[in-house]
Every structure is written in structure tokens, then in C-alpha cells.
């Protein structure tokens, strides 16, 4: 092979190595982003579950108050 062909081959190999290195760096960044996003998703799930529990508790309290009011209104009707 001629010297020029070897130089071209070396250049192409170096370009490939550089590209692979950049892609590896990008993969690492994406892995880090994935970990962060998974942690954020877990936190959001936890917050959603807390809110759902609070909403359910509020609904139960609301139903209890409605029942108490109905009972009081029933007693008032009995008095009248």
C-alpha cells in the first residue's frame, strides 16, 4: 500500500475513534439523565399517591359531615 492510502486509512480510523468516543460520552450523559428522570418519576408517583390518599380522606370526611348534617336535620324535623 502506498503511504497516501495508509494516511487516509489512519485518518478514517481516527475519525471513527473520535466518533465512538463522542458517542460513548453521549451514552453516559443519557444514562445519567435516565437515572435523574427515574428518580423524578418516582418522586412524582409518591406525591401523586399522597395526594390521592388526601383526596380520599377529604371525601370520607365530607361524607361523614353530610351524614351528620342529615342526622341533625332529621332531628330538627322531628322537633317541629
From Swiss-Prot:
Keywords: Cell cycle, Cell division, Coiled coil, Cytoplasm, Septation. GO terms for biological process: division septum assembly; FtsZ-dependent cytokinesis. Transmembrane segments: none annotated. The keyword Cytoplasm applies. One of its GO terms (cellular component) is cytoplasm. It holds the Pfam family ZapB. Its main location: cytoplasm. It is found in: Cytoplasm. It comes from the Bacteria. InterPro entries: Cell_div_ZapB. Non-essential, abundant cell division factor that is required for proper Z-ring formation. It is recruited early to the divisome by direct interaction with FtsZ, stimulating Z-ring assembly and thereby promoting cell division earlier in the cell cycle. Its recruitment to the Z-ring requires functional FtsA or ZipA. Belongs to the ZapB family. Homodimer. The ends of the coiled-coil dimer bind to each other, forming polymers. Interacts with FtsZ. This is Cell division protein ZapB. It comes from Vibrio parahaemolyticus serotype O3:K6 (strain RIMD 2210633). The lineage of its organism: Bacteria, Pseudomonadati, Pseudomonadota, Gammaproteobacteria, Vibrionales. The gene is zapB.
